[in-house]
């Protein structure tokens, strides 16, 4: 049996600080190849996700890794000891990138030939897994698996002319199959994930399956509590399915450093391991790696790699029904407020520092992402924008919990263990001065501000959260938030950008 990675380094552009080895503030090109090597060698991460979604991708990454760092990769076999996993564009959603999907798939046999030359015959398959983002049905991942088998691996049997086959020209094509990891990002698909996985299992018959649960984008689209509870429902469903099919499922969770995006940081990783029992692989995003002291980062990654994997909490039907109800109530409260703040979020997001060379995709669940009826920036910029205007998104929609009775509240608390801790971490950065300033700058309605105030009041009076400045960092962040809004109002954008960067350094994450 192969090693199942515990940690997966990603290229999420959420870092405030720029790593010393980067040639510029925007990490791209050769720097991303170097970053992949450093993730393995310096940080001890088991797996690197190589992202072809929403950006120009270098499909020669394996060639560059093996030729630039031969000593390391002779000792650590790519595909056996450490892993490289492609994140594809979803051809059904991202129409402009359909051919990038094809190009990335076509590059997999090239990596096989390179590894054969480097390691010897039959030693390893360096790239054998792909991640399909925005998966909503089993048909999508079945199609990806079959596309590779039929359109890539089997093309070596095509006859060109007069008995001459493709393989006579370019050699045989390996591997013959790939493993597809669905990345599930929307609420309904997370809560019905068993249908996606079971349908794939019945057709493809894999020996095991890795399933990627998003935590960041569902928070942006439906609110933090909806995202957490949807992941809990998904983990329960996956473990039930694993038992009923007698088939191993290894969940991955996509988590960032701030509470809204998952709260996995070198300072909070133990709480996240406790929160998401049953998860095998945790994403190590850029803020985790570059916004904290290196020794602390390396130690945290080592601890995650060596931590025990506890079983997921299996939900009874009545518990699951309560959690589903909460996600609907919460989203109904959260989305209209976000729609009202969309202009503010979009205006601020374009001023945040850029950390990756990413192309912008437009449209529902593309990039930009959408919540309800409005287009929004990517999740990192979304979160960074709301923190910067002094309204952490963790607080938005929270008063919807007032609709729960005592039994429902108990079920909620049992299934979101670190709820109060996550909320308190975010609430330190709340700025009371924001209301007047955002009303003035973006003409935010009294109704929207009244709703946010209800959420704030509920967090304080019912949950017992302390809002605003409780230490030097939070006080400084609040001051910077007011200065940012004032400079933005006066259109002194160079100063606005400076304050945004300073706040990101305090949070140890752009968003």
From Swiss-Prot:
User: Any signal peptide, and if so, which residues?
Assistant: none
Reply yes or no: does the keyword Magnesium apply: yes
GO molecular function of the protein, one example?
phosphoenolpyruvate carboxylase activity
Q: Does the keyword Kinase apply?
A: no
Q: Which UniProt keywords apply?
A: Carbon dioxide fixation, Lyase, Magnesium
**What is this protein's function per UniProt?**
Catalyzes the irreversible beta-carboxylation of phosphoenolpyruvate (PEP) to form oxaloacetate (OAA), a four-carbon dicarboxylic acid source for the tricarboxylic acid cycle.
In Swiss-Prot or TrEMBL terms, this protein is called Phosphoenolpyruvate carboxylase
- Species in which this protein is naturally found: Saccharolobus islandicus (strain M.14.25 / Kamchatka #1)
Q: What is the lineage of its organism?
A: Archaea, Thermoproteota, Thermoprotei, Sulfolobales, Sulfolobaceae
